[in-house]
């Protein structure tokens, strides 16, 4: 098994057939349980890896072929990748998990870490082969995922910010107003600052997220 690229929180290894994801950090057990539950419920409805086995801190998943969204984005395919990310996100947000989703409070299944960072695509067709990394999934406002995908592009792929129009076109709705998106980005950054603070109080991760909060707060539409 070799360590898989683009894992940012946990320890994820694979051999081309299966993937072992071992959860690290605060709430590791709950995040593993959450990811397992969502993957099981979404199987056959959204492209997600199959769950083969669940141990206390590890999930064994089927390996899904595809190229990581961030690699394809940097290879010059930003419009196609972001359009596919938008279309896949719409499918996620219209899933009815149980009687509570789609209820009149407007909450949907929020992925919780959505963006080209957690999507694999077929490099020939740009079809999404898998949406990965459901450990932060919850019921919430669709803007959370819309804003976070935008944040990933603004922070890590600033040359492609203009292609976010393809993301919203793929999703099929005009972008929510900028102040609402920016507030959602800042809320998520603060939640991640808090997560790193619980993991290693006063550590590099905390400083990193504080810096990112300052940067995000300075952005204009
Ligand atoms: N089922 C899978 N098939 C193929 N690659 C995977 C699979 N699961 C994870 N990966 C690869 O491992 C990386 C890290 O997995 P992920 O669930 O995103 O963990 P993390 O929470 O650490 O980001 C992914 O970005 C992807 O490149
Ligand atoms: Mg990930």
How does the language model describe each region?
Residues 2-33, 40, 71:
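ATP-binding glycine-rich loop module of kinase domains
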Residues 14-18, 121-129:
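Active-site beta-strand-loop-beta-strand hairpin of nuclease catalytic cores
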């Amino acid at each position: 098994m070799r360590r898989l690229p683009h894992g940012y929180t946990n320890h994820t290894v694979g051999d081309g057939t299966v993937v072992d994801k071992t959860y690290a950090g605060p709430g590791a057990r709950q995040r593993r349980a959450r990811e397992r539950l969502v993957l099981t419920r979404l199987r056959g409805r959204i492209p997600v890896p199959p769950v083969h086995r669940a141990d206390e801190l590890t999930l064994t998943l089927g390996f899904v072929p595809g190229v990581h969204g961030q690699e394809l984005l940097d290879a010059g395919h930003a419009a196609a990748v972001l359009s596919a990310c938008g279309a896949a996100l719409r499918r996620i947000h219209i899933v009815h998990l149980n009687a509570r989703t789609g209820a009149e409070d407007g909450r949907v299944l929020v992925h919780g870490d959505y963006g080209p960072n957690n999507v694999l695509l077929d490099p020939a067709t740009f079809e999404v082969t898998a949406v990965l990394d459901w450990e932060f999934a919850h019921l919430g406002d669709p803007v959370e995922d819309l804003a976070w995908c935008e944040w990933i592009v603004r922070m890590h792929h600033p040359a492609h910010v203009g292609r976010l129009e393809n993301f919203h076109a793929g999703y099929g709705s005009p972008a929510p107003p900028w102040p609402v998106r920016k507030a959602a980005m800042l809320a998520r950054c603060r939640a991640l600052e808090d997560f790193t603070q619980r993991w290693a109080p006063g550590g590099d991760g905390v400083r990193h997220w504080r810096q990112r909060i300052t940067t995000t707060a300075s952005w204009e539409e």
